[in-house]
Amino acid sequence: MKTFVRILSLTLVAVMLCATLASCAPASDPAKAEAALKEAEYIVLNDSTITPAVFKLGGYDLTNVVTATKTAEDKEGNTVVELVVIYYFADKDNAEKAFSKVEEDAKEKAEQTKETWVAPTLSGSMVYFGTKNAIKAAK
């Protein structure tokens, strides 16, 4: 009986961990992410032509890029820029292959903002980075 309870407990912990990790990522559909960001008053660009064409020249199958920015005030009243960039690839293999290229883009953007920054993260066929608040708004 003790073994059963331990296994059940570990299983529940694993399920909770998966749910927590999955809730950190933006929406897996570009249109849903765009709608959520617009609702949160972000300026949003959903690009399915120019940036994907550039990535295709590099050998990557990118379908959409959602970029959003918003100027806000922090707790001390300072002006801060919230930013999120979400790359939607055709499949997980393309996302993994392009991850280092996305990291280069993220470094450039990280220098522009000193806010709570989330480094590039791979989630299924998406790669995203930006500030914590902007990523949360993209759900």
Model-derived segments and spans:
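A short, solvent-exposed beta-edge/loop patch
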Residues: 107-139
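Stable alpha-helical elements in mature extracytoplasmic
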Residues: 29, 33, 94-98, 102, ...
